From Swiss-Prot:
Part of the 50S ribosomal subunit. Contacts protein L29, and trigger factor when it is bound to the ribosome. HAMAP family: Ribosomal_uL23_B. Coiled coil: none annotated. This is Large ribosomal subunit protein uL23. The gene is rplW. It holds the Pfam family Ribosomal_L23.
């Protein structure tokens, strides 16, 4: 386990067309800290939003290689968590914490 606080684990909600579609199936998508584990993500969502989490799936999106003024740079990697909530529960990510 790492020493991350609940607010440090969840970086931001992901609001895309795909995340809107999965929200119909009691799922919410968050950008999370790279070091965060699935149990830490589950504990943070349950503590911050007061909901019951049934599953957490994670994926790491690798950063793209970009060119700026002739120099090659690289964007940071982003860890994304798809959190499945218990039946009948929801999170309104548009209002914030």
């Amino acid at each position: 386990m790492t020493d991350l606080r609940h607010y440090d684990v969840i970086v931001s909600p992901v609001i895309t067309e795909k995340s809107t579609i999965v929200s119909e199936h009691n799922q919410v998508v968050f950008n999370v800290a790279r070091k965060a584990t699935k149990p830490e993500i589950k504990a943070a969502v349950e503590a911050l939003f007061g909901v019951k989490v049934t599953a957490v799936n994670t994926a790491v999106r690798k950063g793209k290689v970009k060119r700026f003024r002739g120099l090659v740079g690289r964007q940071s990697d982003v860890k994304k968590a798809i959190v499945t909530l218990a039946e009948g529960q929801s999170i309104d990510v548009s209002t914030g914490l």
